[in-house]
Regions:
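Active-site proximal beta-strand in glycosyltransferases
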Residues: 12, 41, 125, 136-152
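Membrane-proximal helix-turn-helix segments that form the acceptor-binding/catalytic region
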Residues: 31, 108-115, 136-137, 160-179
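A short, histidine- and acid-enriched strand-loop-helix "catalytic/donor-clamping" loop
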Residues: 20, 132-133, 147-159
Length: 206
């Protein structure tokens, strides 16, 4: 079981697995709030998603509507001083072309924002496999991969090939300096990067 030290004076760019404005805050939100309160500069990047659901999925239109509302907020500052941003992306990840377009779009947008906000040598905290293409592109000092789901098994939320999601997940495991699992079962089933893997269980933040 890992207890994260509370440090200060660092820069953190977190690619969350969901939008900051989601009605049920996830563990990444609580962690980033604590880091910001401790005196760290934090940028939280709203979910760049695993792709949109299929056209037949009833969640397609609500997902698009929620994402458009996030885009409308642009870069916003929370009460804790966290910069929350929804970068423009192409919502399809099944092809090399679309992934290349996305990581270039995001690299430019987040890189410029980090420079304006004074972030240097950030800790890159990724909580979704599609952020793996950003590793090595934001001048980061450390890469943390926060695993909170079996991403390739969650096919209800997107139409992307599970095999592609699995490949991205395995790349993230191979390239991360530190891997945090939010569940004991997820950690028990892990096969890659075990020497860098730790359990960070979710809890209620009062």
């Amino acid at each position: 079981l890992t207890y994260l030290p509370i440090f200060s004076g660092k820069s953190i760019i977190c690619f969350g697995g969901e939008d900051w404005w989601y009605h049920h805050p996830h563990s990444k939100n609580h962690l980033m709030r604590r880091f910001a309160r401790a005196g760290n500069k934090v940028i939280f990047v709203n979910s760049i998603s695993l792709g949109l659901p299929s056209l037949r999925n009833k969640d397609l239109l609500p997902r698009i509507a929620r994402k458009l509302r996030s885009y409308a907020k642009l870069a916003r500052q929370t009460d804790e001083g966290i910069t929350v941003v929804s970068p423009a992306t192409v919502p399809f990840f099944g092809s090399r072309l679309s992934r290349g377009m996305n990581h270039n779009l995001i690299r430019v947008q987040i890189g410029q924002l980090a420079k304006r906000r004074g972030l240097t040598k950030p800790i890159l905290w990724i909580a979704i496999p599609t952020a793996v293409d950003l590793i090595g592109r934001l001048d980061e000092s450390l890469v943390v991969y926060h695993v909170s789901d079996k991403y390739d098994a969650n096919t209800m939320d997107h139409a992307t090939d599970p095999r592609e999601i699995r490949r991205l997940h395995e790349r993230a495991l191979q390239q991360a300096d530190l891997i945090l699992y939010s569940g004991r079962k997820l950690l028990a089933e892990a096969e890659i990067g075990l020497e860098r893997s730790h359990l960070l269980e979710q809890a209620v933040d009062f």
